[in-house]
């Protein structure tokens, strides 16, 4: 029987191997969506990822003979420990062939890392922060992945459960029908709610007009989710990074902002056209030709993804979503959108799930993080 050898990623050559491993593993899987290689590389650069300023991280590759058969990253988020009192090793970027010797060796590496730092718990898959991809797929293996969700084969959860890991957090995802005509009560309520609470939908003529609202959006995101047990506030440095990286290419028609009579933001939603098929065609590289597929996906698409939604706690359950959906419908009516897919939502987050009730929600994916208490 061949031994599994674990090696730490110590140079860029090995980092490229680390990034490309799942692309090879899932090369014949029509539902896997590869990331952009340069974006993945930037995750591990301090100048590109502000979370590295308060986190420790290592990456490892698993080998059998000279062949790569698995990978894992381990992370300690010191901000999480200091602000929430949560002391754990996060593990992520977990991929492996269907061989329990490989998955065992990878998890043992995470345990070893935790023990070296006197930490008694590991949890994953997850990234550095709440805005990173998290959760191992447990339902929906036959559904096309999104650019904001992890994908894995059905054997992954079985491997972790056989190793003694247990469910920590559960996420659900929904597919919503984007109606040709909004439900009558939504049309009616949107006007009534706007009038009652003196709310308005902000109109943007260009991307430049959106930028002053980016920071308020993230602050509102904190207000929306701060009651959740695992939520850590977004730092100003993270906001700056996300603003520079993403808001430059998001179509203004996919951003909806609702403000009160004092022009204070009370709700927002960011949707994006599905870039899954464009990413599959890109095969990890945007240039020289793949940018064209992204351009086309933005112009005409039958599917969009809810990327972020934030509603101030004072306005949750007050019908503000009717204003948001009416605005989204108006903005996207000529883009061919038929389905909206939500991002992963914690199962416990009923305040967000109730938002979809008027749009025939289908729970088509589930995912979870697994944890293990480490014995001394």
Region annotations inferred by a language model:
Residues 358, 362-369, 373:
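A structural motif corresponding to the C-terminal lobe/cap of the Radical SAM core domain
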